[in-house]
UniProtKB/Swiss-Prot annotation:
Ca(2+) binds at D173, D189, D190, D220. After processing, the propeptide and the large and small subunits remain associated by non-covalent bonds. In vivo, the unprocessed enzyme appears to be the predominant form. It comes from Trypanosoma brucei brucei. InterPro entries: Caspase-like_dom_sf, Metacaspase, Pept_C14_caspase. This is Metacaspase-2. The record marks D95, D211 as: Important for Arg/Lys-specific substrate specificity. It is an enzyme of class 3 (hydrolase).
């Protein structure tokens, strides 16, 4: 079936990611065994150059779904297994398959998708997830976005930290590791923020999922979910401003696999999560996609709580985080396409 799907993509036809997401995959070792550790500060991204490089780039339509009239839907998927290196993982490309399958089954009408993975026979693959490609396609994702448009971003791979360059109050910057990070360096949270948000207009909806270590604040968004009495406590959840000066015009929400100081785990057999998939994959991606598929009317708050609870029941210590560009009304029904209702009591 894998070869059939690849042949269909090569022939310009659409891949069945729902079917692909349910295929068997090779078992893996946990991400935790292969944590990268502290990395040297990388060179900064030239954001203007990235947007120039994004001119003329295009994605492909991954499936046919009922369109959103007058609105464009773009998506960027990144999965990196670091094949043949000391940093090798096994489940990250499977995470992308699982996320694609989930969005296809939910009927998200993606007009253009870009898939950056280091798995050569991945159906619909755009290119390798090198530093240069990730940077230019981040710019592509938001380039020319207009009010009403919908954007989706998914990253599964290594996340790590580097010492801050001193331009923030934080001791460490969070960063993601491209497939060529040992040669070209990582991409820090400050640059991720600038690439995705510096030119994002109002009333654009962007959802991001980061399944990697040290990802809690990797987008440097100003508001985060908190719960009185601790992250797993039963107190009243609410949004809290944690940053000044990082305001974003668009409606952006990120779910990360863990807090900044934590690592994100892999599982050898994702069948234990009941998502329909098997083989290696990220625990956070499996829980998030399970929640999206099996609960049609979850609120933003419940989506995070249920994801955390599922991980805890299965013995994982990581605590997924929710951050946003605005103080989301956590009782609002979660949507990939609709703008936020805002909790006006949060300043």
């Amino acid at each position: 079936m894998c070869s059939l799907i690849t042949q269909l993509c090569d022939a310009g036809q659409l891949a069945d990611y729902v079917g692909l997401g349910w295929l068997n995959a090779v078992s893996s070792q946990p991400y935790l065994v292969q944590a990268l550790g502290l990395q040297p500060p990388p060179r900064r991204v030239d954001v203007d150059a990235a947007f120039r490089d994004a001119e003329g780039l295009h994605g492909h339509q991954p499936w046919v779904a009922t369109p959103l009239p007058g609105r464009t839907v773009r998506a960027l998927f990144i999965g990196i297994n670091y094949y043949g290196t000391s940093a090798a993982l096994s489940g990250c490309c499977n995470d992308v398959k699982q996320m694609l399958a989930t969005l296809q089954k939910k009927g998200l009408p993606i007009n253009e998708a870009v898939i950056l993975v280091d798995e050569d026979n991945f159906p619909g693959r755009t290119d390798q997830p090198t530093r240069d490609n990730i940077v230019r396609y981040m710019a592509w994702l938001v380039k020319d976005a207009k009010p009403g448009d919908v954007l989706f971003f998914h990253y599964s791979g290594h996340g790590t930290q580097c010492k801050s360059r001193g331009d923030s109050d934080e001791k460490y910057d969070q960063c993601i590791a491209p497939v060529d990070f040992q040669k070209s360096g990582c991409i820090v949270d400050d640059d991720i923020h600038k690439l995705l948000f510096s030119r994002l207009p109002e009333k654009v909806r962007l959802t991001a999922v980061f399944d990697c270590c040290h990802s809690g604040s990797i987008m440097d968004l100003p508001f985060t979910y908190v719960c009185s009495g601790g992250e797993q406590a039963s107190g009243t959840p609410h949004m809290k401003r944690i940053r000044e000066g990082n305001d974003v015009l668009g409606d952006v929400m990120m779910i990360s696999g863990c807090a900044d100081e934590q690592t994100s785990a892999d599982v050898k057999n994702t069948a234990t999560f009941g998502t329909g998939s098997t083989g290696a994959g990220g625990a956070a991606t499996q829980c998030i996609t399970c929640m999206l598929m099996n609960n049609q009317s979850l609120s933003y708050g419940k989506l995070l709580i249920e994801t955390r609870d599922m991980l805890k029941r299965k013995g994982f210590k990581q605590v997924p985080q929710l951050s946003a560009s605005k103080a989301i009304d956590l009782d609002q029904t979660f949507s990939l396409t609709e703008m936020f209702s805002v909790d006006r009591s949060v300043q």
